[in-house]
């Protein structure tokens, strides 16, 4: 297993959505002010099955939308 890191979030295209709870080993830890939303797998190691980074939409307590990029263990 290795951790892959990229500097920016690629554009979403041809990527299946995945519940954040399945991203075991990720560096993103939900807190009381960050509610996990939908994580989108981005093209990465294997365009069909794996991605380098996931983009997660979080809703802080003030109701604003916040996008968080996390590294995914692949």
UniProtKB/Swiss-Prot annotation:
Q: Which domain of life is it from?
A: Eukaryota
| Annotated protein name in UniProt | Uncharacterized protein C29E4.9
């Amino acid at each position: 297993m290795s951790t892959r890191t990229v500097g920016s979030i690629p554009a979403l295209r041809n990527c299946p959505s995945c519940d954040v709870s399945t991203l075991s080993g990720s560096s993103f830890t939900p807190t009381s002010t960050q509610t996990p939303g939908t994580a989108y797998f981005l093209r990465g190691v294997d365009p069909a099955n794996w991605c380098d980074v996931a983009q997660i939409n979080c809703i802080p307590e003030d109701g604003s939308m916040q996008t968080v990029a996390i590294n995914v263990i692949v």
